[in-house]
Amino acid sequence: MKIQENYFYKLDDLKEVKVIWKKYDKANILEIGVEYPTAIVDLDRFSGIPITKEWLLKFGFFIVKTNGLIEATLPNFRFTLNQVKDYNGFFFCENENVLMNIDYVHEIQDLFSAFLKRDLVFSDSVS
């Protein structure tokens, strides 16, 4: 898993944290700083946060439920995230074509950054 600054991950499978800085030695990450509680932690303590409807709402997505399907959209973003019954992640779609599965918060942050060249932000604090 690639660790990015300003992305959210799960620390020790317990607490959701935002990475605020990384320190490198050549190509290797030596230290990672996270906010609240401020700490320096090892890379192997991070895991992905499962993507949920609540996380998408924090990022400003609009959620619509119809016939067992959840569709998440953003203004001025031509792609949608769709979730079907009995699947925990979302399908990243263009029109009705599934482009890939999204299972974690950092994956939607990566996609958003790649397509729009800016970070996905939200106003709610992570608790």
Regions found by a protein language model. Name each.
Residues P37-F62, N101-R118, F122-S125:
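Intrinsically disordered, low-complexity, charged/polar segments
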